[in-house]
């Protein structure tokens, strides 16, 4: 079982990124996948998180106590979820200087950073062989995702 937490703030595209992630895996693999969303204060800037579980057999609940991966679209939100970590939890954050440097040099619009980080994450977990671009529109978002997959 793989437990993944996407976290960030309202307006950063966390729900959009998780929808792309779950739909692509659901329609293109033999894995079971289940997710849940939690919106904080319903406004831009409020905390948002999505818990995603992937398994080869039935999943009975999308909620978990320990994350294998935390994907932090904000750079600071992962601190809020330290209670879901273990010594083996890997945190992938947009605050990583090498990721920021690559994103800035690509001169992509700021709103594509969620798909850039999603691309980096799917590459990290070796799932970049799925037809991700079929689920991502428009072209700027595809470019950001592909750039993330190269890191």
Which role fits each region the language model picked out?
Residues 1-151:
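Active-site cofactor/cluster-binding pocket
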């Amino acid at each position: 079982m793989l437990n993944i937490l996407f976290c960030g703030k309202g307006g950063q595209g966390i729900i959009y990124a998780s929808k792309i992630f779950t739909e692509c895996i659901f329609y293109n693999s033999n894995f079971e996948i289940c997710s849940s969303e939690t919106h904080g204060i319903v406004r831009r800037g409020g905390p948002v998180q999505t818990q995603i579980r992937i398994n080869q057999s039935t999943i009975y609940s999308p909620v978990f106590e320990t994350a294998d991966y935390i994907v932090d679209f904000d750079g600071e939100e992962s601190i809020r979820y330290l209670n879901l970590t273990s010594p083996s939890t890997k945190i992938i954050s947009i605050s990583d200087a090498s990721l920021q440097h690559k994103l800035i040099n690509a001169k992509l619009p700021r709103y594509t950073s969620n798909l850039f980080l999603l691309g980096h994450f799917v590459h990290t977990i070796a799932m970049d062989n799925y037809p991700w671009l079929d689920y991502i529109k428009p072209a700027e978002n595809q470019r950001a995702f592909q750039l993330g997959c190269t890191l």
